[in-house]
């Protein structure tokens, strides 16, 4: 009896020890699991968040800006041409919303000071051109009413482009009958596009190299809500037309826009289109401020001057200036400063060499 009782007690003790050992083992396992889950997960979560943030930032840097304006199709090649005349515009540049106004000519902000500075600027050439041709003609004895003048000095790109039959001319006008410049430039081998909203057909192909388009160049595109067929004429920005035509550059841009030239020139500067132009020939009108140019007389003249200084910053140099004495001699509706109401100015982009 005593032996049996001892064996039962031993078995009970063994079972208790086994239960205690099993409990200790389970507690140790659960404790280790809890430590593993409570420590590293925070690091894992933080690492994952940081990795996600880096991915998002990388994607944001790689995505093009929503505000970027693209007017020309992108080249499939990433390399840039050595000649500035064939370089594409940098579409990653930030958009400019206004030009940089020049400091006032004097502390008094007077019209006299602004007008004297401006008139001196437009009547003083900045670079010498030894080989100028007017209206596309070599014969300088021809008396042209409007001397649209280009520079064919060898140091500039236009002479080479004409020789290689690769030059392109854009002519902007409003019902102008005289197209001698366009015809003569086409006969020299240039591809000439004349934009005039007054022509009868949508497009007229004259000869081998001259196209007439029933389009009016504006400083803004028409609102999308306005249907095209409701417009009497089609108006577009020059950058939009470049994109639609697939043109990367313009060797010569001639413009006679009857006081719309100021806002058009501003648009070309702000959107970088002017950098794709080799030579500019503009007829400017000074008898009134121009379309959508506001402010008092001093502010208007300061704005005009600032536009031309913007061109100068882009390395455009004035090589020809013409004062039209056949037009009224008025400056902002006044007969002052011995100024004409109309001048023709020619610039060359000295980056195109």
From Swiss-Prot:
What GO biological process term is on the record, naming one? methylation
Q: Biased composition, Polar residues: where in the chain?
A: 74-86
Places the protein is found: Secreted
Which EC number(s) does the record attach to this protein? 2.1.1.-
Which UniProt keywords are present, listed alphabetically? Answer: Methyltransferase, Secreted, Signal, Transferase
Q: Which InterPro entries match?
A: Methyltranfer_dom, METTL24
Q: Where is this region: Disordered?
A: 73-92
The UniProt entry lists the main location of this chain as secreted
- This protein's GO CC annotations: extracellular region
Root EC class: transferase
Tell me the superkingdom of the source: Eukaryota
Q: Does the keyword Signal apply?
A: yes
GO molecular-function terms, A-Z? methyltransferase activity
Signal sequence span is 1-27
Report the function annotation for this chain. Answer: Probable methyltransferase.
What's the family?
Belongs to the methyltransferase superfamily.
Tell me the protein's name: Probable methyltransferase-like protein 24
Show the taxonomic lineage.
Answer: Eukaryota, Metazoa, Chordata, Craniata, Vertebrata
